């Protein structure tokens, strides 16, 4: 969405300022998250207002003021336009997900990879999804496959959201949300598959 971001803001920023927009924005449900270079921090309110006006499906615009960091893989967000709420509903490949974009890790940019890996899971398999977050991969794997997925995350907010997401979706398989250190859960017993992608600090 980098080109779209530049196009949307071309009438409110100078050409030089527009060129400094080096990062795309993410839209998760009705929430937009944008990164703004230090040189344009003074323009963050007008950037947020313009995005809110131009993207009809958005109700909130947040500026990401820190990278993803810590054991819980969370980031600091500052509302710059619209509603100051960080929870929303996101849909992907036929599943509904309740996500909190500030309190639990989530990235819409991994959707293709999630779908690809979920397609490798077979009926009857047991899968340990380490760093499982709100259950994105886990629910996609169990949606049309009679498998059991243990979704493990050390972040209690992510674990609770995964539990809620498993309840609001119709699954052929089963997703079990576990809150804790994935190494403590997965070391003692074998699993047919382990999904252990650790998201980078985005």
Feature locations, PLM:
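Residue-level preference for short coil/turn positions at secondary-structure junctions
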Residues: 28, 57, 92-93, 116-117, ...
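Carbohydrate-binding surface patches
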Residues: 32-40
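Active-site glycine-rich loop that binds ribose-phosphate moieties when present
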Residues: 112-113
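Conserved SAM/SAH cofactor-binding pocket of Class I
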Residues: 118-181
